[in-house]
């Protein structure tokens, strides 16, 4: 048995690297399992969803070990595991899923029915998602390993592209899911709300799917400049020029075929004054306004049932002032919920290995040490155009 260290949430605005228990072959209720593996973590990423917790915008308990974006090397195998072996390099979908229940069999692994006693769906290191220990650590347990893990073939080639492959655990499939559920295809005009890592992953996915034009909107000028550098059109939502007018200036018409919400419940308003304050319904309402009749809206951005820091009493319980009548009148289709990573990760792995997508450059991957994780959280919260990837064992240098 080895020691272990991980990134621990200690209350709003505070995370710390601490000694934590080495993983055991047990579920969160303490029951012995034979279907799991223990990984030496090769990479684990800081996600915008983690930031929601760290900002105190969820009911996450102090002491929670963070991290749901994990790539690792198998170092221990449960007695019931059949397809994994010691030394395998694997990508871990952020969804914890059993593979046996109805929703798993229907590829809805984001809402597995058995891994979380409180509700459908499980994830590592996340509030209300089953108590599975997070992977921003040196070692982590992965249950139902035969079902959940994506083996990365050819370890040497994979390590050469590890900065890209680390995005397979969440943000690339999540962005892709947003684009797919928004109906993106060859020739589509697409608007992406949010120039953070998920928004850029959605934009890159739209391009991969054949979109003619991809517009990324945000209130953060630094992130918009990065998006522009990656070849996307941009809409500056901190300006008083309405979004539909900015789109019309680019396309010659004020609406798009497809739209993606990559922001979620901590959205800000639009315009010089509006962008200075939260307005959680802004993105959804704006997307209904600029999506054409019979268009589709993909919503991978996170919305919660409880938000202690919400701007009003209704939003504290996930109730937002949505112009649903507009969406109904325009016959919009909406798709929400946790991304079923397994539905896409194998194909996206192939796209990375064959240089069809350079996701690390697009989302601004910056590799940091485990000890630098608190600093990474601080910089990410300040809005830098980066995706922080933690390298707990300094393996990237050897790659």
UniProtKB/Swiss-Prot annotation:
Residue positions binding Zn(2+) 2: 98, 101, 104, 112
Catalytic activity of the protein: formaldehyde + NAD(+) + H2O = formate + NADH + 2 H(+); acetaldehyde + NAD(+) + H2O = acetate + NADH + 2 H(+)
UniProt keyword terms in alphabetical order: Metal-binding, NAD, Oxidoreductase, Zinc
Gene3D superfamilies: Medium-chain alcohol dehydrogenases, catalytic domain (3.90.180.10), NAD(P)-binding Rossmann-like Domain (3.40.50.720)
Any one Gene Ontology molecular-function term assigned to this protein's record: formaldehyde dehydrogenase (NAD+) activity
CDD domains: PFDH_like
Cofactors (names): Zn(2+)
Keyword NAD attached: yes
EC number: 1.2.1.46
Binding-site residues, Zn(2+) 1: 47, 68, 170
Annotated InterPro entries: ADH-like_C, ADH-like_N, ADH_Zn_CS, GroES-like_sf, HCHO_DH_non_GSH, NAD(P)-bd_dom_sf
Residues that bind NAD(+): 48-49, 52, 198, 218, 223, 263, 268, 270, 300, 302, 337, 339
Coiled-coil segments: none
Top-level lineage group: Bacteria
Cofactor note text: Binds 2 Zn(2+) ions per subunit.
Family named by the database record: Belongs to the zinc-containing alcohol dehydrogenase family.
Entries under NCBIfam families matching the protein: fdhA_non_GSH
Function description: Dehydrogenase that catalyzes the NAD(+)-dependent oxidation of formaldehyde and acetaldehyde.
Oligomer status and interactors: Homotetramer.
UniProt-recorded name of the protein: Glutathione-independent formaldehyde dehydrogenase
Natural source organism: Pseudomonas aeruginosa (strain ATCC 15692 / DSM 22644 / CIP 104116 / JCM 14847 / LMG 12228 / 1C / PRS 101 / PAO1)
